[in-house]
Amino acid sequence: MVKALLVGSKVLIPNVDESRYIYSTGFYGKAIGISKPKGPKDIIRPLELSLIESVYLAKKGLIKVIDKNGEVLEYEKLYEYSSKIINKFDIMYRVYEDLREKGFIVRSGVKYGADFAVYTLGPGLEHAPYVVIAVDIDEEITPHELLSFGRVSHSTRKRLVLALVDRKSESVRYIMFKWVKM
């Protein structure tokens, strides 16, 4: 199991060989100081993981997260910690996990105004074809919000996907929008 260190809202894998291994299992994390690696061979620095990635990898048994006091944070404790740091973490994590389990590569979508950028092949191999916004199925979305989501995805030539999370059934449903010129 790979040793990872919790540092605020990030998790660091200091060992470069272990960083390369984790990256190779599904394009997880970002190598510090390397902007666009083409593959695992380009991972020559420690890897920085988001909390969502870290919770997922901890649940899978791929990483062991250690806090500043040297305590190992098991999946449940790391999930609880992340819920306090990230707004709507439970919704975001449910979507992240569902997409990963379906075989997609899921990265942060912040630069696209979304929760996630989703790849079928991986970053460095293609541009993300989808941007995903995670929403509680019971939450109302105004027409204005929907248009603003669409504007971002259209200007970046990505398909907008709303991921609707039903907390009761723990299911995720997806609605994809394709914008057309008329």
UniProtKB/Swiss-Prot annotation:
Homotetramer; although the tetramer contains four active sites, only two participate in the cleavage. Therefore, it should be considered as a dimer of dimers. It comes from Saccharolobus islandicus (strain M.14.25 / Kamchatka #1) (Sulfolobus islandicus). This is tRNA-splicing endonuclease. NCBIfam families: endA. GO terms for biological process: tRNA splicing, via endonucleolytic cleavage and ligation. Its EC number is 4.6.1.16. The keyword Metal-binding does not apply. GO terms for molecular function: lyase activity; nucleic acid binding; tRNA-intron endonuclease activity. Endonuclease that removes tRNA introns. Cleaves pre-tRNA at the 5'- and 3'-splice sites to release the intron. The products are an intron and two tRNA half-molecules bearing 2',3' cyclic phosphate and 5'-OH termini. Recognizes a pseudosymmetric substrate in which 2 bulged loops of 3 bases are separated by a stem of 4 bp. Coiled coil: none annotated. InterPro entries: tRNA_endonuc-like_dom_sf (IPR011856), tRNA_intron_Endo_cat-like_sf (IPR036167), tRNA_intron_Endonuc_cat-like (IPR006677), tRNA_intron_Endonuc_N (IPR006678), tRNA_intron_Endonuc_N_sf (IPR036740), tRNA_splic (IPR006676), tRNA_splic_arch_short (IPR016442). It catalyses: pretRNA = a 3'-half-tRNA molecule with a 5'-OH end + a 5'-half-tRNA molecule with a 2',3'-cyclic phosphate end + an intron with a 2',3'-cyclic phosphate and a 5'-hydroxyl terminus. The keyword Zinc-finger does not apply. One of its GO terms (cellular component) is cytoplasm. Keywords: Lyase, tRNA processing. The active site is at residues 119, 127, 158. Belongs to the tRNA-intron endonuclease family. Archaeal short subfamily. It comes from the Archaea.
